[in-house]
């Protein structure tokens, strides 16, 4: 159980925020909130609430339920605790987009980096409302790309390490 260590980190974050001249509006966790044990979400949230500001969350592969029926059902624990797996919000003049690019393929721990068509359509609509010149921050768990060699050759052995359909995503 890593909650005692998390408690320590949360206290450090709270101390830093109190001592800072900056105005921290929220924190952003980029996934793997808990290590497969979704029953500790409530305790995790209680600890993190001591930081003095709200957190927004991105779903990670460890936040999904494996051995389930489908990709859609793999997200239920996360959605029941935190809400939708993809959403957007504005803070000041910045538009934040959170996406789920963990695509669980219905077998063991196997997932790929992939953004499904529903999210791509939603993303197109969301971006259509944003005035040109607005700063946009996109957050997702799996990197869109790792390095030049990744861009040159698609490798089945590392499909869980980067976004498989990044060309479609980059066109957005």
What is each PLM-predicted segment?
Residues 38-135, 155-172:
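Extended active-site neighborhood of metal-dependent phosphoesterases/phosphodiesterases
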Residues 20-21, 98-100, 145-147:
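Short amphipathic alpha-helical segments, especially helix-boundary/capping motifs
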Residues 39, 148-151:
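A short acidic (Asp/Glu
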Residues 35-36, 64-65, 144-147:
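Short, active-site-adjacent cap segments at secondary-structure transitions
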Residues 1, 31-33, 61-62, 101-102, ...:
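Active-site metal-binding loops of divalent metal-dependent hydrolases
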Residues 1-42:
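N-terminal active-site segment of His-dependent metallophosphoesterases
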Residues 30, 130-149:
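Short acidic, glycine-rich surface-loop motifs adjacent to enzyme active sites
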